[in-house]
């Protein structure tokens, strides 16, 4: 089967975000010779991308299966667990989603993700080894990802992350979060973006912020808007949802909706509290 190198399909899980989104936006603007299609698992994401004026398909739709058979490049930002049969023979461009400072993928030896990771490498190892190009951002990260993911050096691409290097303005949601929360234009924006814990993705937020009332008092006194941006594996945690329900109307707290790409407003962020990456 001959694949068309001028058709690129993209996916970043269950949202329009991440490095695939930023490369998607860049190619649409600067490479009109390439057809770009955003692939979706759910109708709400497909409809959202279509409302932006872009082409989008569901993986399990007739149109989606057709475009998967034709496309030459599949852009992702993770080592996917599932590759649809229609993707056989496609080139995978893995942009990854954050620099590495912990054990990932093949080097994971415990935690709640270990079994899923082991299964996907048993199932997909041939694809990872033979069809996947992998983006790395430095010599240090080359060594890290070669060890952690079993990537051969000749399959590495050395470049910056699209979400950090693409300078085209992108606006897929209202950016004036100060006004949305009723704060003044000179309010400072601070983002708190922790990653999940390997051995406990649940009951994290109250341990991290034991006195929310005191925190909100300080934020109000300092005229700070604190954006709580949880990892997708944490945002559905019962404890986090309880805190969100109790404090979401506080003008100095914004519980971030991961459907919105926080990188669109990064130029307006004054400080970030992070412990890994902002994916």
Locate each region found by the language model.
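Active-site and donor-binding regions of nucleotide-sugar-utilizing enzymes
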Residues: 8-171
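Nucleotide donor/acceptor-binding cores
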Residues: 5-6, 90, 187-190
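Donor nucleotide-activated moiety binding/catalytic core segment of transferases
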Residues: 57-71, 232-279
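Glycine-rich nucleotide phosphate-binding loop and flanking beta-alpha elements
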Residues: 81-82, 141-143, 198, 234, ...
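Nucleotide-activated donor-dependent transferases that construct or modify glycoconjugates
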Residues: 1-14, 195
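Catalytic donor nucleotide-activated moiety binding site of glycosyltransferases and closely related
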Residues: 35-51, 216-257
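Conserved catalytic-core segment of nucleotide-activated headgroup transferases in glycan assembly
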Residues: 15-25, 29, 148, 158, ...
């Amino acid at each position: 089967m001959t694949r068309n190198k001028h058709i690129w399909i993209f996916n970043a899980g269950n949202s329009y975000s991440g490095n695939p989104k930023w490369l998607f936006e860049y190619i649409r603007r600067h490479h009109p010779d390439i057809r770009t299609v955003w692939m979706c698992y759910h109708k709400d994401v497909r409809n959202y991308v279509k409302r932006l004026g872009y082409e989008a398909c569901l993986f399990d739709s007739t149109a989606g299966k057709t475009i998967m058979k034709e496309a030459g490049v599949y852009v992702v930002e993770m080592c996917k667990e599932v590759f649809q049969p229609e993707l056989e023979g496609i080139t995978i461009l893995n942009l990854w989603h954050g620099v590495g400072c912990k054990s990932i993928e093949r080097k994971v030896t415990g935690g709640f993700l270990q079994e899923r990771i082991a299964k996907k490498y048993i199932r997909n190892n041939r694809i990872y080894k033979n069809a996947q190009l992998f983006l790395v951002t430095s010599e240090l990260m080359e060594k890290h990802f070669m060890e952690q993911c079993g990537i051969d050096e000749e399959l590495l691409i050395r470049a910056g992350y699209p979400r950090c290097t693409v300078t085209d303005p992108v606006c897929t949601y209202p950016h004036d979060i100060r006004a949305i929360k009723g704060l003044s234009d000179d309010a400072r924006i601070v983002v708190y973006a922790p990653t999940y814990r390997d051995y406990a993705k649940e009951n994290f937020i109250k341990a991290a912020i034991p006195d929310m009332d005191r925190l909100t008092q300080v934020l109000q006194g300092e005229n700070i808007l604190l954006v709580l941006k949880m990892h997708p594996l944490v945002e559905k945690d019962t404890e986090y949802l309880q805190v969100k329900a109790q404090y979401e109307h506080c003008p100095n707290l914004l519980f971030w909706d991961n459907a919105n790409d926080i990188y669109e407003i990064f130029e307006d962020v004054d400080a970030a509290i992070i412990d890994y990456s902002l994916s």
